[in-house]
Amino acid sequence: MSQQPKYRFYPTLLDSFQNYVDSDSIWDKYYGTSEDPSISVEEFHDQKRRDLIDNINRVEHESSEAAAKGTCLNEIVDRIIMKQKSSESNVIVKTVRDFDTCVGAFNSVVKDENSEDASELAKETITRINQPFIFASVDGFRFCFDIAFCKEVANYFSDCLCQYRTSATLPTSKGEVELYGYIDYLREKSIFDLKTTKSYSFGNYSKYNQRHAYPYCMEESGMMSEVRDFEFTAYQLSGGNSRTPLITGKQNKEVYTYSRSQSVEILTENCERFIDFINDNISEIDIEKTKIFKDR
């Protein structure tokens, strides 16, 4: 008889742990060739450790522009696929075809205390873009997406099931672990995760735990009899600045054939190492806020 899970992990939390483990090599990749790096390898290591502890404790951080941009594109694509004009998401999405709708879009996010004039912003935006676009805003960031680009992305994921929650239990020598999370897009025997990036090179997502956890969860839970592959569909975005406000992008596909035995081995090792880290640093974990323990 199966035991109740002792821990609950989602893939990006395991990724945060992996970034901490790999902090030296990550530092070397981005700062190793600099004669005067802005951060030392020791400081970078400490930063990744702090990030991990904060993620475990569910500490809220201000969203970055890059993260907000990705969230907005995902929301736009979901609404196009599901033919929804609104959702329960906190992302504001409006199709702008003229000056008045542009003013309305900016009015929905511009706060009086910012002393910004929505009409002036709308006029400047309309003049620069000079074509209909999709306005999206979240966490104080505003973006203008090219309609044709958004439809192209949505068309690629047409007939997909969107934002599907999955979970399953993984046995480890340290205790049962519940793996869980939301799959961006699901079609037949393939699982897709939509990524946005400023620059891309193949293999960017090779160590991401999503490609192991989500297929495992879908098969283990019985929701899919077989998962063939996992695809990171990465869009390298351009635009989104004052000079070129309209955002468009280029598609890059990073596809991994799913091997259950390989993924189980990797997930088990990652979870067991993460559990060791948790036990070694239990004094820094906020038991009241964290959700990594199943029975608390």
Regions found by a protein language model. Give the residues of each.
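Metal-dependent nuclease catalytic cores that hydrolyze phosphodiester bonds in DNA/RNA
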Residues: 1-182
